[in-house]
């Protein structure tokens, strides 16, 4: 299991279109992927779960990956979240 705190640098945060693209990226991996914000943990492969966190730009989230490609998934998703 890999766990890392990440600051969301996307201009619009993880809302609507960026959230859909993030979920699409997360679904490329076989690992289980979760995002935690303010004590609430959701499946990062679920658009509804992700939207329920209301992640805005500048938010700090915890990204958790667990599985065969956990490291690769972590790196790809951090790169996505930290894009400005």
From Swiss-Prot:
Keywords: Phosphoprotein. The keyword Phosphoprotein applies. InterPro entries: HPr, HPr-like, HPr-like_sf, PTS_HPr_Ser_P_site. The modification Phosphoserine is found at residue 46. Residues 1-84 form the HPr domain. Pfam families: PTS-HPr. Belongs to the HPr family. Involved in carbon catabolite repression (CCR). This is HPr-like protein Crh.
């Amino acid at each position: 299991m890999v766990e890392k705190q990440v600051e969301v640098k996307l201009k619009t945060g993880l809302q609507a279109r960026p959230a859909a693209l993030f979920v699409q990226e997360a679904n490329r991996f076989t690992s289980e992927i979760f995002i935690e914000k303010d004590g609430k943990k959701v499946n990062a492969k679920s658009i509804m779960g992700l939207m329920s966190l209301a992640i805005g730009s500048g938010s700090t989230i915890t990204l958790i990956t667990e599985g065969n490609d956990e490291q690769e998934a972590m790196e790809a998703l951090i790169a996505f979240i930290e894009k400005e």
